[in-house]
Design a protein with these regions (language model features):
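Active-site HxH/HxHxD metal-binding segment of metal-dependent hydrolases
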Residues: 46-138, 227-237
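Short Pro/Gly-enriched beta-strand edge/turn motifs at strand-loop
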Residues: 9-15, 117-121, 142-144
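Metallo-beta-lactamase
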Residues: 37-39, 44-45, 124, 131, ...
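C-terminal regulatory/interaction regions
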Residues: 235-253
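Conserved beta-strand hairpin/beta-sheet module of binuclear metal-dependent hydrolase folds
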Residues: 3-55, 160-172, 176
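Short glycine/proline-enriched coil/turn segments at helix->beta-strand junctions
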Residues: 34, 57-60, 76-82, 164-166, ...
């Protein structure tokens, strides 16, 4: 198996596909139902993630992205059946709103890429989704139902994926242990707070983040929500407020 990816089993029918050799330590998740499989995020695109997925399942695979930033859609080109939120459709069809060279510089930072990957030829994925997903939609995999939650803030079309029956929340870049990014021009700190308030209402048992450590306890959602609320009360929940450190996580505004 390609050594770019690290494979872990969260459950018998849930596989974590990680890119630990990159500084962002991106995680993608393969959820298998009785009829089809769902791939949440497709990573950086350094190596062909579809080869790994095909070793895991022989069922039809639908790919979704928590949001269409370059580090979450790199493998989308291998999955014609992919979905996105309508708020990010222009980013997929009209060009990504960040200079290519900035992304390339960020891509290679502190990372030894495989010799087979030519960074100079890297292109940000562009394509038309097979379907658009909206808040409240349910993806039925056969014996497993995954609910779409529109959670903007980090990105306009950011989505979390909620498996109510198991209490599993796939949080993308909304929640993880490191520095949350709410400083890009396309981020919205106020929306970020509303999204945290939304997921804080859920009976979450397991958090599956898109980056860094997998040891994320559900209580971090409440702590993040409360921190955002405090910043808003102080008039600091806005771009330009800098980096605020909360111990096991931080926020850059």
């Amino acid at each position: 198996m390609n050594d770019w990816f690290t494979i872990d089993r969260a459950e018998e029918d849930t596989t974590i596909i990680s890119e630990y050799r990159h500084w962002e330590k991106t995680h993608c998740y393969l959820l298998e139902g009785s009829e089809r499989s769902l791939l949440i995020d497709t990573g950086l695109g350094v190596c062909d993630i579809s080869e790994v997925v095909r070793e895991m399942t022989d069922k039809p695979v639908t790919a979704v992205a928590t949001h269409v930033h370059w580090d979450h859609i790199g493998g989308h080109r291998y999955f014609p059946d992919f979905c996105a939120h309508p708020a990010e459709l222009p980013w997929l069809t009209e060009g990504f709103p960040q200079p290519r060279q900035e992304i390339i510089d960020c891509f290679a930072h502190g990372c030894t890429l495989p010799k087979s990957f030519e960074l100079s030829k890297y292109e940000i994925f562009q394509g038309t989704p097979a379907r658009l997903l909206r808040d409240g939609d349910v993806i039925d995999l056969g014996g497993r139902k995954i609910q779409v939650l529109h959670t903007p803030g980090h990105a306009p079309g950011h989505m979390c994926f909620w498996e109510c029956e198991r209490g599993s929340l796939y949080t993308g870049d909304l929640v993880y242990k490191k520095t949350l990014a709410a400083y890009f021009p396309t981020t919205d700190p106020e929306e970020y707070l509303r999204s945290l308030e939304k997921i804080a209402e859920l009976p979450v048992k397991r958090v599956f983040p898109a980056h860094f450590g997998l040891d994320v306890e559900p209580d971090i959602i409440l702590r993040m929500r409360d921190a955002f609320r405090e910043l808003k009360a102080q008039g600091r929940l806005c771009h330009g407020s800098g980096v605020i450190d909360y111990g096991d996580w931080a926020l850059r505004l």
